[in-house]
């Protein structure tokens, strides 16, 4: 998939918004830019960059443009394509918020977009499927969802815990058979 590229109009809107100051991301001049960003990432992968839940058939309102490095702390990275993706409201607003706990201690500021700077699976620097496999099977009203960390990946384990992926793991088939639910926490 091609990298996110801004149009001349996008760059102009971004510059005007920054020049006006204030809360730049919420400037109305950026509506078209945000639409283009969201479209780019939806075309790339119609899933949350953290939990991999599908956005297929979802309205744009439930899909957030995600700033991997929070815009409140890393304003200079606000429009950097490496710092943008799409995420579900749960992962973006409920869990991650403006946290930076996922950045390794002692990282070099000039290497902020180096994958070794991040404890979790970075949406643009890492390949999710090299760290975690998400298995989801649905049959009528029953479903099974399981996240499997591959090759003892530390990024996989961190992502699993940080984004509470175990909350999504369903064992409806066990319930249907009257079997007890087994604790899934790592």
Language-model features: locations:
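Extended charged
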Residues: 1-41, 54-58, 75-85, 89, ...
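Residues immediately within or flanking Cys/His clusters that coordinate Zn2+
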Residues: 45, 62, 85
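Long, hydrophobic/aromatic-enriched structural stretches that serve as scaffold segments
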Residues: 52-54, 63
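Histidine-centered catalytic micro-motifs used for acid/base chemistry in nuclease
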Residues: 65-70
